[in-house]
Amino acid sequence: MRLSYVFVVFAASLLVTADTLSTNTGVQAANLVGPAQRLLRKHYTAAENDGDSEARALNPEKMKTMWKAGMTVDGYAAKLKLTDKIAAAANSAKAMEKLGETHKMKKLLRYLNYVAEHTAV
């Protein structure tokens, strides 16, 4: 009876050593033979993406002349053709968020902040 235990232990140790001695050929390693180009992510800024952004920018001088000429925020929204888009997006948070990411809406909000700062004084 004890001889059967010896055979079981011998068979188990044989199986364990057979698993440890087998090599895995499915592993692929990086080839480090020579220099290679690394593909890194590059994050572009708005200035890099848009070459003519300065020409379209709403700077303080333009806002000052618009304000002195009597341009209201609603009038500027109409000039940018945003009134219908704002009215359509008023009931949807997703639509308003998407509209807020546009260049025209950012210009309108910049002018709105300028007018709010200068009328409060």
Swiss-Prot record:
Where it mainly occurs, coarsely classed, is: secreted
Question: Signal peptide: which range, if any?
Answer: 1-18
InterPro entries given for it? PexRD2_WYL (IPR040691)
User: What is the role of the protein in this entry?
Assistant: Secreted effector involved in P.mirabilis colonization of host plants. May perturb the signaling of cell death associated with plant immunity, via interaction with a host MAP kinase.
What family does this belong to? Belongs to the RxLR effector family.
Q: How does the record comment on the protein's domains?
A: The RxLR-dEER motif acts to carry the protein into the host cell cytoplasm through binding to cell surface phosphatidylinositol-3-phosphate. The WY domain contains 3 alpha-helices and is required for the interaction with a host MAP kinase.
Q: What is the recorded name of this protein?
A: RxLR effector protein PexRD2
Q: Which organism is it from?
A: Phytophthora mirabilis
Q: Which gene encodes it?
A: PexRD2
